[in-house]
Structure formats: structure tokens, C-alpha cells
């Protein structure tokens, strides 16, 4: 376990760490209140593409989480920023509930493909349209490439397998904007005044949450909720700084050993 260092910021994953769909992880609300009592900056970072930031915030508040909109950094935010920098017109393969986060982005006559988690759109006709755009030279932008995520009824395919299918079919490589990309974590820390070495990431995905954070110099805490499966902590090198049962246990460790 790494030595204690000056901790200034805590990054927290949402789905699978604080909640699973419309159910909170037991004890998570109270644990967040305890963490807020410490002298640390908190940011909530998520790869979710199933809903807009506003809808996500409403879901969290209904679960009685004390969270403000400016504390949330999403992969949809990162994707929009990239689209604006590149000045492209995307074919948006995202859930309809996520479309408000792309308001004002021109989508007619698309010359780029943006792919998130959009089960209703992942059928042959739509994917073939994306395939043809890519063959014509359009860039492929993946909001993230998670292999799977946790639902109430079990694990479910994430966008990663569908992004990889288009990469394979077109012999191209997607630009990924969400976790575990280094730029995602650095952007999430922007404005906090904190360096990666002064931050810790808590999440249920060993690769995207913990591995990605540790690659930029943060500590990574893996929780055994959400998509976690036995021995996940052995799948990355270096291994997680800490593996624990749930978010409340992670908060206990931070308060007792990192502050």
C-alpha cells in the first residue's frame, strides 16, 4: 500500500459505485456526507451516455445524494468539447436521453461518428450507415469503450464491443474521450488546483476507473460493487492502491489513512 501523501481531491465514479440504476449502494449517502466533512475537493466522474447531465443529477438527488451540477464531469462533456474543437458534424449514436448535452451541435450531413451506449440504435441499418461514413473518411469518436456495465438484472454489454466492431470493419482507430483516457482525468481535475498526485479515484471498474487514474499518478481504490467481479484487482499492473467492499469502506480508509 502506498505511503500517505497530501490528499486534496477525491474523484468518485457514479454508476456501480454510488448507485446501480435507481438504487443507492447501501450507506453511500451517509458516507458522502462524512467525506464532505473533510478538507477535500470532490468531483464525480462518469462514463454514462444513457442520460444527460441534468437527468443524471435529478436521479442522484432523488436518491438523496448531496451533489451539485458543477461537481459532475461526464464523458458526454468531454465528447462535446472535442466536437467543438474539431468543428465536425456528428452522427450521434447515443441514447436519446443524452441528446440535450449536444444541443446546438450541427448534425445534418454528418462527417463524423460519435458512439456511446445506445442499445436502441445498435442494429444493422444504423451501424451500416456509420460504417459507410467511416469508409468515406469520417473520424470515429468513442465516448468510452467499456466492455460491460451493471444493471439491476445483471451485467450488460457496454459500447466497447460495438466500437471495436466498427474499428475492425473499417480498419480505423477510434478516438476515445472518456475513462480510462489520461485527458479525461486531467480535465476532471482542471479547476480544482490539484495535481494528480494529490488525488484519489474511487470506482468499480478496475481498468477504466482505477487503472486509468493510476496511469496519471492518482491513487486508485477499487470497490466490490457494481460491475466488479472476483479477482478484477489482479487484471491491472500496478494493482489498485486499495480494494475494498464498497464506497463507505473507501471513505473510511481515506478519512483514517489519507488525511
Curated annotation (Swiss-Prot):
This protein's encoding gene: HDHD2
Pfam families listed in its UniProt record: Hydrolase_6 (PF13344), Hydrolase_like (PF13242)
Binding site for Mg(2+): 13, 15, 204
Keywords, ordered alphabetically: Coiled coil, Magnesium, Metal-binding
One Gene Ontology term, aspect cellular component: extracellular exosome
NCBIfam families hit by this protein: HAD-SF-IIA (TIGR01460), HAD-SF-IIA-hyp3 (TIGR01458)
Needed co-factor(s): Mg(2+)
Name by which UniProt lists this protein: Haloacid dehalogenase-like hydrolase domain-containing protein 2
Cofactor note: Binds 1 Mg(2+) ion per subunit.
Organism: Homo sapiens (Human)
MF-aspect GO terms: enzyme binding; metal ion binding; phosphatase activity
Residues that hold substrate according to the record: 13-15, 46-47, 179
Residues annotated as signal peptide: none
CDD domains reported for this sequence: HAD_PPase
Disulphide-bonded residues: none
Similarity field: Belongs to the HAD-like hydrolase superfamily.
Modification sites for N6-succinyllysine: 50
InterPro entries listed in its UniProt record: HAD-like_sf, HAD-SF_hydro_IIA, HAD_sf, LHPP/HDHD2
Residue ranges of coiled coil: 47-71
Amino acid at each position: 500500500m502506498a505511503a500517505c501523501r497530501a490528499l486534496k481531491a477525491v474523484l468518485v465514479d457514479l454508476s456501480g459505485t454510488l448507485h446501480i440504476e435507481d438504487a443507492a449502494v447501501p450507506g453511500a449517502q451517509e458516507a458522502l456526507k462524512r467525506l464532505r466533512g473533510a478538507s477535500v475537493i470532490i468531483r464525480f466522474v462518469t462514463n454514462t451516455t444513457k442520460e444527460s447531465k441534468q437527468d443524471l443529477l435529478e436521479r442522484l438527488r432523488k436518491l438523496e445524494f448531496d451533489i451539485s451540477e458543477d461537481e459532475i464531469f461526464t464523458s458526454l462533456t468531454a465528447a462535446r468539447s472535442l466536437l467543438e474543437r474539431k468543428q465536425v458534424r456528428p452522427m450521434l449514436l447515443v441514447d436519446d436521453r443524452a441528446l440535450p448535452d449536444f444541443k446546438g451541435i450541427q448534425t445534418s450531413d454528418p462527417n463524423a461518428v460519435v458512439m456511446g451506449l445506445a442499445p436502441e440504435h445498435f442494429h444493422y441499418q444504423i451501424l451500416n450507415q456509420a460504417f459507410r461514413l467511416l469508409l468515406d473518411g469520417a473520424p470515429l469518436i468513442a465516448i468510452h469503450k467499456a466492455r460491460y456495465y451493471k444493471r439491476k438484472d445483471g451485467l450488460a454489454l457496454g459500447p466497447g464491443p460495438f466500437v471495436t466492431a466498427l474499428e475492425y470493419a473499417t480498419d480505423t482507430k477510434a478516438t476515445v474521450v472518456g475513462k480510462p483516457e489520461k485527458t479525461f482525468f486531467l480535465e476532471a481535475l482542471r479547476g480544482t488546483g490539484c495535481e494528480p498526485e494529490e488525488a484519489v479515484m474511487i470506482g468499480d471498474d478496475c481498468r477504466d476507473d482505477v487503472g486509468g487514474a493510476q496511469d496519471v499518478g492518482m491513487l486508485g481504490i477499487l470497490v466490490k460493487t457494481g460491475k466488479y467481479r472476483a479477482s478484477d484487482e489482479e487484471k491491472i499492473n500496478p494493482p489498485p492502491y486499495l480494494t475494498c467492499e464498497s464506497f463507505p469502506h473507501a471513505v473510511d480508509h481515506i478519512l483514517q489513512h489519507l488525511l
